[in-house]
Design a protein with these regions (language model features):
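Short alpha-helix boundary/capping elements
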Residues: 43, 47, 93-96
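A general secondary-structure signal for short beta-strands and their flanking turns/coil
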Residues: 4, 64-66, 84
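Residue-level signal for alpha-helical context at structural boundaries
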Residues: 33-37, 57, 106
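Enriched for short, Lys/Arg-rich terminal
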Residues: 74-136
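A generic structural signal for short, solvent-exposed coil/turn residues
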Residues: 1-3, 61, 92
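A short, surface-exposed loop/turn module that caps and links secondary-structure elements
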Residues: 45-77
Length: 136
């Protein structure tokens, strides 16, 4: 099911309009562009990173996987996990496409439960993807 190929990375317009915009406001354009390139690189080679603490698999089906990627903003001192920055990504393993559904800071969506909150957002905004994981 999994591939050793390179993934094509796509940022969903929803995350561009909402969460990326908020993160980009808090940091310089240079920091955000470097961070985005880093996220793209990691996702292009996600199979190497899924085995580390930078990413974790959340849901798996024949259609693909949903993963959570931990990342830090370029030029900051925190580790990827401690930075509280996350990306929720749908991996279509058959097409080798990594579709970034959400990029957020835990500060933005932490209450009352981060996981429940981002899952609800993904359920609401991406029902066509979540139907693929309906047995969860």
């Amino acid at each position: 099911m999994y591939t050793s190929g390179r993934y094509l990375v796509q940022f969903d317009p929803y995350t561009e309009r909402h969460y990326i915009k908020n993160i980009a406001k808090r940091h310089s354009d240079r920091q955000w562009q470097a961070t985005r390139k880093s996220i793209e690189f990691v996702l292009e080679h996600i199979e190497k990173h899924i085995l580390t603490d930078k990413a974790e698999t959340i849901h798996v089906s024949d259609a693909g996987r949903i993963i959570k990627l931990y990342f830090k903003i370029a030029g900051t001192k925190d580790s990827a996990k401690r930075s509280s920055n996350r990306a929720v990504v749908f991996l279509n393993d058959k097409l080798c496409v990594a579709r970034v559904l959400l990029i957020y800071s835990k500060e933005e969506i932490c209450d009352p439960n981060e996981t429940a909150r981002w899952q609800k957002i993904v359920d609401d905004q991406f029902p066509e993807i979540m139907r693929k994981f309906s047995s969860r």
